[in-house]
Regions:
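"…together with the soluble PPM/PP2C metallo-phosphatase catalytic core" -> "…together
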Residues: 1-258
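Alpha-helical transmembrane segments of multi-pass membrane transporters/translocases
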Residues: 14-19, 304-310
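Membrane-interface capping segments at transmembrane-helix boundaries
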Residues: 25-32, 334-351
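Cytosolic, membrane-interface loops and tails of multi-pass inner-membrane proteins
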Residues: 25-54, 260-292, 352, 356-359
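N-terminal hydrophobic signal/anchor transmembrane helix of membrane proteins
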Residues: 237-240, 326-343
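Alpha-helical transmembrane segments of integral membrane proteins
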Residues: 286-304, 313
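Extracellular/periplasmic helix-loop-helix junctions in multi-pass membrane proteins
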Residues: 307-325
Length: 359
């Protein structure tokens, strides 16, 4: 295993160096083509930064990903589908970063990318084994997989509101999945190669994106979410529900934050994906934490979920599950008392009570 760890470290280091260097070029390109994130004072907008910032960071991550693949990847139909799908995601995001496009146009790009993974790559969520029972999805496997990939593609972009937040959360995810793959002896698996290459790529980006950020991921944060979705589906090819459970639990923070954001907006009569300033990180900022400390707190929570995942998968399922429940209750209590059910939102609280009475 020591040899595999050293080999994996080499992949991460080389892609990290390339990513860190390419980000310098991406800043200049972004300025040249006017792909800048300009702060605005519009009500409900989630901008925190005060100055215009280049936003092609995710393009740099994609280029580092390609570089890592050329050095360490192996050609296959699955890998080809991932490259094609990723290119579609990045191309869509570049267009949106230069001149914002409509939501349905972006969604069309995401659907096409997901379709490439499913129909060309053959990566499909076609069954699930849980509690000793096997459930076949049949033709429903196609819409289920499509929905899952599109959801993952957007989840990172939705929580990308602070310097270093998306890059750090994604790095924790890729590191955790890589550790699981190595510990289980899957040294030549596509999951491990993808995780290591993406870990180096996101860490190189994080070097420039951590507060104070000199470059943002831009709409290309969808690329990181897309790869996370693909890796999760590949992991799900394992023998049981645990294969799906691990990557989902590592993403507990963005999943819970996004879920409650959608509920909050629907209860307010807003569009579910409309930007606002009531995400978990906004609540921490409202408690007078600095932007850097807010991100570090979220890192810590995510790392604790990651540790619980590693214990659950590799050591003791009971202890891992207990840790999950404790962490989930803590996060749930915080979110409910700061974002949805809160004295800050008395009208919203009345709406919730009214809906509960009707039901």
């Amino acid at each position: 295993m020591r040899e595999q760890i050293l080999s994996g470290s080499k992949i991460v280091l080389i892609t990290f160096i390339f990513s860190a260097i390419i980000m310098i070029l991406m800043k200049k390109v972004a300025v040249h083509i006017n792909a800048l994130d300009v702060p605005t004072d519009k009500e409900g907008h989630r901008h925190i930064h005060k100055k215009s910032t280049p936003k092609l960071g995710a393009v740099g991550i994609f280029l580092a990903f390609l570089f890592g693949y050329m050095l360490f990847g192996e050609q296959s139909i699955r890998m080809n589908s991932i490259l094609i799908g990723s290119f579609i995601i990045i191309l869509t995001s570049i267009v949106d970063d230069i001149k914002p496009i409509k939501a349905w146009q972006k969604m069309s790009g995401h659907l096409v990318a997901a379709a490439v993974i499913i129909f060309y790559g053959g990566i499909l969520l076609n069954n699930i084994t849980a509690f000793g029972l096997r459930f076949e999805f049949g033709w429903l496997a196609y819409p289920i997989t499509l929905f899952f990939l599109v959801a993952c593609t957007n989840i990172i972009n939705l929580i990308d509101g602070l310097d270093g937040l998306s890059g750090g959360i994604c790095s924790i995810f890729f590191l955790t999945i890589a550790i699981i793959a190595i510990a289980q002896g899957r040294y030549n698996s596509l999951v491990l190669v993808l995780s290591l290459i993406m870990l180096g790529s996101t860490l190189g980006f994080l070097l420039h994106n951590f507060n104070p950020a000199s470059i943002f991921a831009g709409d290309g944060a969808t690329f990181m979410g897309f790869i996370i979705g693909v890796i999760t589906l590949l992991e799900f090819k394992g023998p049981a529900l645990i294969s799906f459970f691990a990557p989902v639990c590592v993403l507990a923070i963005p999943i819970l934050d996004t879920l409650f954001a959608i509920i909050r907006r629907l209860l307010k009569g807003q569009k579910p994906f409309q930007a606002d300033r009531e995400h978990l990180h906004h609540q921490l900022l409202g408690m007078q934490f600095s932007q850097r400390n807010t991100v570090l707190i979220i890192y810590l929570i995510d790392i604790l979920f990651s540790i619980a995942t590693l214990i659950f998968v590799l050591k003791d399922k009971k202890i891992g599950m207990i840790l999950f429940i404790i962490l989930f209750v803590i996060v749930l209590w915080f979110v409910l008392h700061t974002s949805i059910i809160s004295e800050k939102n008395p009208k919203l609280l009345d709406k919730i009570k009214s809906k509960l009475k009707r039901s």
